[in-house]
Amino acid sequence: MKIIVLFVFAVTAFIFKGNAQKIVPIESNGKKYEVLDMTGKGKIQWGGYEEIAGDAAKSETNGAANTIAIVAAVGENKGYEGKPYAAKLCSDAKDGGKDDWYLPSKEEADIIYTFKEKFNVEERGTIWTSTEANGTQAVTKYWYTGAHYNNQKVDEYHFVCLRKVQ
């Protein structure tokens, strides 16, 4: 009986550990952040084609506000069969016992890029930012050159989540 219990415990511990995402501390210009490396979850959509009201998700500096606006507008992504999307997964993340994760803005992605060797994005890969370009496109960060591009919101790319450390 003890052998079976130990085996079940070991399998459960392995599954739990396998689902945990890596948290990477970074610092830039005296500001401290934690990056939740979600690249292991594979590629995912930014969200549906809902244009976010006004300029609510167009900030190039405030990913937290963008994420709130995206999740409010896209909701459960019913227009795309309820597929998970980057901003929602960041908003719902509880990793490290924290609940203030968000999809980084364009400029916050630039900060993360300076630490790119710490993340599991393929050399010519791309990550989402929370900055909306227009109703059908959002800004992405190209990992190979560091350039930004506007891509279709329903395309699939890697993503990371960010939180500010007080």
Protein language model regions, located:
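Bacterial Sec-dependent N-terminal signal peptides
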Residues: 1-21
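Glycine-aromatic-enriched surface loops/turns that form tight recognition elements
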Residues: 16-101, 106-166
